[in-house]
């Protein structure tokens, strides 16, 4: 059975995102777009591309601390390289952890491995209220 996001994220479930791999500051997220996820050119809408990348990067950051319950996005930058058509996989990698923020990067690839988009992001881990946050 593939890993789960470990928390209920209704928006990601609604889109059908799948957490394929997570651990050690890395995560892979799969997305099989439906017609309602496409733009007028029959490619995945840019907001969908950003969502898949955000899920991969934030999951990579979250994997570094088992005590956190999530990672909130502070900043996300995406460079769109080519139209995303068909099933895609986003890979995120945590790059550096500061005192309160984590930095990550990643790519969105098609089934052949071609890079469709690149992203960098800044994230803040979220902890249960019991930790005083």
Predicted regions and their residues:
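Terminal targeting signals and extreme-terminal segments of soluble enzymes
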Residues: 1-133
